[in-house]
Amino acid sequence: MAMYQNMLVVIDPNQDDQPALRRAVYLHQRIGGKIKAFLPIYDFSYEMTTLLSPDERTAMRQGVISQRTAWIREQAKYYLEAGVPIEIKVVWHNRPFEAIIQEVIAGSHDLVLKMAHQHDRLEAVIFTPTDWHLLRKCPSPVWMVKDQPWPEGGKALVAVNLASEEPYHNALNEKLVKETLQLAEQVNHTEVHLVGAYPVTPINIAIELPEFDPSVYNDAIRGQHLLAMKALRQKFSIDEKVTHVEKGLPEEVIPDLAEHLQAGIVVLGTVGRTGLSAAFLGNTAEQVIDHLRCDLLVIKPDEYQTPVELDDEDD
């Protein structure tokens, strides 16, 4: 079954070029599916005009929405004329990430694509507050698209958590690998690599416990990770030569390997916590993301529930 048949593209209101829309069309050409070009807009000055009646205010809002809709249609003109099914929707909402997630839920969208900004071609991608909210709270996978052509023969790198005792991490690892393999097969037979990072010995342990042998500890940790990686790759018949178990912090290991492999995309799982720790995707994931220079696909566990609710007035 083809994946991602109902894509939501978040339009960037500040530029004519729309890399996320381009990537969605690229996917559509290979796996089919519908595309919705979506833009939440809000202008505080329109809310401040107390001299206007509610009807006049609504008409002004509607005027802005119509202008923006026509502008997006112009950006998508080439694709629309080529027969790509793109629906355009502009909404008035003062919290873009909520508008996007509400649209994902209401429209049952199975993938969100959004452009990631960067200072220049060499630097890491910069994530806005809206990006972070989406990565943490969007129930569907979120694909952050870099404003660069896909590298020739660009690979997909799946970051897996091999250390966890928690059963949900195994399920999430398997989901990441399965979905990436499926996507790679359907899109352009992309080579898929797996990476797991394992920690180095904490120096303070070696100092506090003179009889402690760091090399034995390191070997044991590496051995555990290698066994976990072997079990995972064998489940999916993945060749050992495209799996990587590296010593170091994930936020260093994963971006470095992505660059070394010239990966087009890194795929990460996030547990997406709510409540007190809602500010974190999991520190590790956030730090990895901050160091990346390629596209990013963030996938949540099956049981993830977003804290964002539909507005009552949503139809």
UniProtKB/Swiss-Prot annotation:
Query: Per its UniProt record, what Pfam families does this chain match?
Result: Usp
Assigned keywords, A-Z: Cytoplasm
At the top level of its lineage, which domain of life is listed? Bacteria
Q: Which Gene3D superfamilies match?
A: 3.40.50.12370
Q: Where in the cell is it found?
A: Cytoplasm
Q: Is Secreted one of the keywords UniProt gives this record?
A: no
Whether Cytoplasm counts among this entry's keywords is: yes
- SUPFAM superfamilies assigned to the protein according to its UniProt record, in alphabetical order: Adenine nucleotide alpha hydrolases-like (SSF52402)
Any one GO CC term of the record: cytoplasm
CDD domains named in the record: USP-E_repeat1, USP-E_repeat2
Q: NCBIfam families in the record, alphabetically?
A: PRK11175.1
Q: Which PANTHER family match?
A: UNIVERSAL STRESS PROTEIN E
Its annotated function is as follows: Required for resistance to DNA-damaging agents.
Which family does the similarity line name?
A: Belongs to the universal stress protein A family.
Recorded protein name is Universal stress protein E
